[in-house]
């Protein structure tokens, strides 16, 4: 059962569907575009399921943000959840495989790491330096664990990277995200590509 607090602070109850053997994984705030603070009893497995399978872009993004915040928070608290890290990395691999360059903007959004301000809200006593360090460490982890997938994806993107704006926006956004992961993971070739893009005569690529 799902309980929602209405404007009069009364609990509204929505019953589970009859005939279902298993309790459904709820996808809410669909097509939502604003931040919202809410609580639920969805499990980590539920969020992994939504991240991989939901057909609503906002819900998939939100599930991914929750999972990444949980991973980074655990690392900051010195309670590394290796099982969650492994599951999420595999979920990213599956997402790359399913979306590839067919929806570059969505894939880039799903791979976006939570901002430092969001991570700071998870703690009563904030340590900005440690939060920043663990956020970078998590990005290095992603860059190392899915290095090959990211390299192949970046090569596929480069085919259409020079399309005249607004075409190619998603590809350029995704390429920037991929290069960030790979550069942080120490890929010297990608670092060189980043420098060349910055000094390139193509303003479209440089600004991306």
What do the PLM-derived regions correspond to, one by one?
Residues 15-208:
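Long, ordered, helix-rich scaffold segments
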Residues 2-18:
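Exposed aromatic-hydrophobic patches
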């Amino acid at each position: 059962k799902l309980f929602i607090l209405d404007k009069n602070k009364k609990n509204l109850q929505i019953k589970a569907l009859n005939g279902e053997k298993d309790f459904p994984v709820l996808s809410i705030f669909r097509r939502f575009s604003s931040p919202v603070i809410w609580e639920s009893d969805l499990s980590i497995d539920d969020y992994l399921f939504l991240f991989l399978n939901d057909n609503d872009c906002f819900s998939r993004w939100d599930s991914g943000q929750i999972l990444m915040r949980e991973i980074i928070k655990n690392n900051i608290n010195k309670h590394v959840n290796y099982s969650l890290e492994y599951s999420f990395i595999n979920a990213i691999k599956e997402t790359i495989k399913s979306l590839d360059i067919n929806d570059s903007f969505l894939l880039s959004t799903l791979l976006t790491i939570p901002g430092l301000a969001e991570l700071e809200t998870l703690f009563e006593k904030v340590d900005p330096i440690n939060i920043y360090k663990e956020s970078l460490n998590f990005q290095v982890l992603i860059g190392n664990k899915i290095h090959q997938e990211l390299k192949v994806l970046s090569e596929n993107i480069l085919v259409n990277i020079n399309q005249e704006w607004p075409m190619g926006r998603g590809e350029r956004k995704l390429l920037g995200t991929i290069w960030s992961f790979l550069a942080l993971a120490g890929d010297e070739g990608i670092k060189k590509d980043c420098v060349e893009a910055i000094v390139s005569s193509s303003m479209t690529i440089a600004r991306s």
